[in-house]
């Protein structure tokens, strides 16, 4: 009861593992993050060599053993989720980052930041949108706004998403802060956090998280935000959050809190509902039609290459 009054949490505490070895800032940085998150009513399992009050240490000799131990804890359901610096997600699964934007201090989800939603760039960005909506809804945004970063494939992604909306999928598009508006976002929209979810490819998203978390430190120490986020994909139900080797204690603690929030809101139940709703609105048909449209162009390129060789 006393702990509940102190932390404001009376339910079952989320159990989150953290692999502490391998950081550019040493184990002490990771343990500092574990202690910070533990004060917020989270059971933190620190995988490494250090110990501290309020944190459960799982002793390992090195980073490789730490990863094996993390996977064991996840497989046995001894923990509800994990925060780590690298993880081999399967194709179809990618991570949704969460940052604090500088202009107005608004939080923004970056969909996506690591992993590969699809080998096709535009299909990947369409799927990233669904993954971003899942993460945002799990963090309490009932109708999150979606913006598409003005990168290669943005317009094709917009067309597919608007067709999905027309077919009944619940999606709310953000309006760019620029005078011409629209849901395709520019650089000032990134800085202002115009949409709740910024859709892009994972390489661009990775750079955005890096810049928005470490622009005040020169890049060697990620000081703000929640890291690169959880791996999300259809049928995937293992909560693994990604931080980088440059992530400082505030970001790692943010990632642990992000994980705890997803556990409490039952993110994978939200994901199931969202995928059903998207499929009902014809997501698979839209993706198949898009692939068919891109075939003639790729076949023409192949013919030209053959002609050059002959």
Label for each model-derived stretch:
Residues 1-50:
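N-terminal phosphate-binding or glycine-rich loops at protein starts, especially the Walker A/P-loop
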Residues 10, 140-146, 170-178, 231, ...:
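Flexible, glycine/charged-enriched surface loops at secondary-structure junctions
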Residues 16-28, 115-126, 242-249:
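Short, glycine-rich nucleotide/cofactor-binding loops
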Residues 55-110:
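N-terminal glycine-rich phosphate/adenylate-binding segment common to multiple enzyme folds
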Residues 60, 64-68, 157-217, 289:
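Active-site rim loops that border cofactor/substrate pockets in soluble metabolic enzymes
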Residues 101-118, 192-284:
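Glycine-rich phosphate/nucleotide-binding loop
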């Amino acid at each position: 009861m006393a702990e509940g009054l102190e932390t404001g949490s009376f339910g079952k505490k989320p159990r989150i593992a953290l692999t502490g070895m391998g950081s550019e800032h040493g184990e002490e940085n990771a343990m500092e993050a574990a202690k910070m998150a533990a004060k917020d009513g989270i059971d933190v399992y620190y995988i490494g060599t250090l110990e501290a009050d309020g944190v459960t240490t799982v002793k390992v000799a090195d980073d490789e053993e730490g990863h094996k131990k993390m996977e064991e804890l996840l497989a046995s359901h001894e923990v509800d989720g994990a925060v780590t610096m690298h993880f081999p997600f399967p194709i179809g699964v990618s991570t949704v980052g969460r940052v604090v934007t500088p202009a107005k201090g608004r939080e923004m989800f970056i969909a996506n930041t690591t992993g590969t939603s699809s080998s096709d760039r535009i299909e990947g960005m369409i799927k990233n949108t669904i993954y971003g909506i899942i993460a945002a809804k799990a963090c309490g945004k009932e109708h999150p706004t979606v913006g598409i970063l003005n990168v290669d494939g943005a317009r094709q992604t917009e067309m597919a998403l608007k067709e999905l909306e027309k077919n009944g999928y619940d999606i709310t598009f953000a309006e760019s802060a620029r005078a011409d508006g629209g849901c395709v976002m520019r650089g000032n929209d990134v800085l202002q956090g115009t949409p709740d979810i910024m859709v892009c490819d994972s390489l661009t998203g990775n750079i955005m998280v890096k810049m928005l978390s470490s622009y005040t430190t020169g890049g060697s120490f990620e000081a703000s935000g929640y890291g690169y986020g959880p791996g999300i994909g259809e049928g995937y139900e293992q909560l693994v959050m990604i931080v980088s080797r440059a992530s400082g204690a505030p970001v790692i603690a943010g990632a642990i809190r992000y994980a705890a929030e997803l556990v409490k809101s039952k993110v994978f139940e939200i994901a199931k509902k969202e995928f059903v709703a998207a499929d009902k609105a014809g997501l698979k048909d839209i993706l198949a039609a898009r692939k068919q449209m891109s075939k003639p162009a790729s076949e023409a390129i192949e013919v030209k290459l053959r002609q050059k060789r002959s």
